[in-house]
Amino acid sequence: MLCLCVVAFCCISNGMASEVYNNAVKVTFLSWVTGSTKISYERVLPNRQSAEICTSMIGAGYDKFQNKPLGFTMRYSHKFFLTSNYQGGLTGFYVRPEAIYSHYNYNAQETLLRTSARMGALLATTGYQLTYKRLVVDGWVGGGYAFGTPAETGYHHGFALWNVFGKKNENIALSFSIRLGYCF
């Protein structure tokens, strides 16, 4: 069933990109709900590649952990669009390596003292980007290695640290998201 849905999605989306655009400005969908505002810029490069830089203002959004975070996140990713699915410009399936740095201060739950979290992560992600007229939708999932001084919550406004079934690992970073944007 999943294979059928993927094939149908690919067939429908093949004719959607009417023009080829080389630039996009995107906002991470629902980033405000997780406590930050994320804006990114993507530029098409030769040989089915693109480069993307994203910046995030931590604290410009809903404070879901009630710890008053304030800081920033920077990330760079380099997309490699897959040959068989590449449709030109900003559309198609891709894989990408990412480098992320997150730095912010927050109120610790136990002491309420301002505490600093500084984390970096190197991720491998895969996703699909679709353009329709001037609208771009980009969704991905990935994981990789994290390092630095983690926050109590394990959430670093660009990736989350492994916390499954009560097992924490401060060196495994996970990331997924959806971005919406404008092509030009």
Model-derived regions, located:
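Flexible, solvent-exposed loop segments that connect beta-strands
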Residues: 57-69, 101-120, 149-169
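Transmembrane beta-strands of outer-membrane beta-barrel pores
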Residues: 29-33, 55-61, 80, 99-105, ...
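Transmembrane beta-barrel architecture of outer-membrane proteins
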Residues: 22-24, 34-36, 71-75, 119-123, ...
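Membrane-embedded beta-strand positions of outer-membrane beta-barrel proteins
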Residues: 25-27, 41, 51-55, 76, ...
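Cleavable N-terminal export/targeting peptides
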Residues: 1-20, 184
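Short loop/turn motifs that connect adjacent beta-strands in outer-membrane beta-barrel proteins
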Residues: 18-21, 48, 83-92, 131-137
